UniProtKB/Swiss-Prot annotation:
Xref: Gene3D superfamilies: 1.10.520.10, Peroxidase, domain 2
Role of this protein: Removal of H(2)O(2), oxidation of toxic reductants, biosynthesis and degradation of lignin, suberization, auxin catabolism, response to environmental stresses such as wounding, pathogen attack and oxidative stress. These functions might be dependent on each isozyme/isoform in each plant tissue.
Catalysed reaction equations from the record: 2 a phenolic donor + H2O2 = 2 a phenolic radical donor + 2 H2O
EC number(s) recorded for this UniProt protein: 1.11.1.7
Organism taxonomic ancestry: Eukaryota, Viridiplantae, Streptophyta, Embryophyta, Tracheophyta
Glycosylation site positions: N166, N180, N241
Name of the protein: Peroxidase 2
Binding site for heme b: H205
Organism per entry: Zea mays (Maize)
GO biological process: circadian regulation of gene expression; hydrogen peroxide catabolic process; regulation of circadian rhythm; response to oxidative stress; response to stress
Keywords: Calcium, Disulfide bond, Glycoprotein, Heme, Hydrogen peroxide, Iron, Metal-binding, Oxidoreductase, Peroxidase, Secreted, Signal
Length: 335
């Protein structure tokens, strides 16, 4: 019998290079960790298609449905992370959840739409798809439909639903539309979001409606930079003193009200935006340049918006034992 030969050793330089390649491959394989693309490919392969079909129908009926779920994603993710806590109804043990907070009530919409999508998913794959992922998928699809496909991106999933919701947290993390740039930037920085993310995500104000109470006091009742013609128009639509029973809504973008496009940035430049928080983007050289770039460079905003949406939808997600998959998006499971 021939003597066994000793195995050849790998040169240290080759071994080190191999480790680097493995590390690079690992990073490339899971850029959205702890989320992943195609999370439901085995457990509910039709999940994303069900959400997409539901959103297509809802937006065809009313484009405002798309704007509502895009806003809902922001209001969910900035408070306790992307965990569908904004969907929870009040209970005797939690009488003031996020949805009753001033930033959400009565302006946040889309709850019934999410309920309908959840019902469809429960019929297809009971107990599998989280409400948090439904919001994320719905916002992704709304962006695509409202932009006529110009905003199109993959949304990683695997979020779990939270079990805590308190209105005070919404007030803490969702700054009002009367905010200046410093307050806006601080609210984004706390969440690890950049000044560019702030400017890019503000572009979602190109769709949807706003209650008059969100801008009358600081844009119409006092001197502001708002375009005089727009101010005159708004005064025909908004009472000088809004109340809970007299608080009409107006389009945020009167030029292309139902299109996800760069018109918002053109409106900022022409001082035809509703909110102080929108006008504030022109109060620093850095953000003013970003506004101009988004308004002028073809495809620039769409690309940045796609990346910022995924980044926002990955904030403080709950996985593993941190959450649950709710059976009803409005209530936590009781086992």
């Amino acid at each position: 019998m021939a003597a066994a030969t000793a195995p050849k050793t790998m040169p240290s330089s080759v071994f080190a290079a191999a480790l680097l390649l493995l590390a690079a491959a690992a990073c490339q394989a899971s850029p959205y960790y702890p989320l992943e693309l195609g999370y439901y490919r085995y457990t509910c392969p039709q999940a994303e298609a069900i959400v997409k079909a539901s959103m297509e129908k809802a937006i065809a009926q009313n484009p405002g449905n798309g704007a509502a779920v895009i806003r809902m994603l922001f209001h969910d993710c900035f408070v306790e992370g992307c965990d569908a806590s904004v969907l929870l109804d009040p209970t005797p043990f939690s009488p003031t959840p996020e949805k009753l907070a001033a930033p959400n009530n009565p302006s946040l919409r889309g709850f019934e739409l999410i309920d309908a999508i959840k019902d469809a998913l429960e019929a297809a794959c009971p107990g599998v798809v989280s409400c948090a992922d439904i919001i994320a998928f719905a916002a992704r699809d709304a962006s695509c439909f409202l932009s006529q496909g110009k905003v199109s991106f993959d949304m990683p999933s695997g979020r779990l639903d939270g079990t805590f919701s308190n209105a005070s947290e919404s007030v803490k993390f969702l700054v009002p539309p009367t905010s200046n740039l410093s307050d806006l930037a601080s609210s984004f920085a706390v969440k690890g979001m950049s000044l560019e993310d702030l400017v890019v995500l503000s572009g979602a104000h190109t769709v949807g409606r706003s209650h008059c109470s969100s801008f009358v006091s600081d844009r119409l009742d006092v001197p502001s930079d708002i375009n005089p013609a727009l101010a005159a128009f708004l005064r025909t639509r908004c009472p000088p003193n809004t109340t809970t029973s007299d608080d009409p809504t107006v389009m945020q973008d009167v030029v292309t009200p139902n299109a996800m496009d760069i018109q918002y940035y053109k409106n900022v430049l022409s001082h035809t935006v509703l909110f102080t928080s929108d006008a504030a983007l022109l109060t620093s050289p850095e953000t003013a340049k970003l506004v101009l770039d988004n308004a002028k460079i073809p495809g620039w905003w769409e690309d940045k918006f796609e990346k910022a949406m995924v980044k926002m939808a990955s904030l403080e997600v709950k996985t593993g034992h941190q959450g649950q998959v709710r059976k009803n998006c409005r209530a936590i499971n009781h086992y």
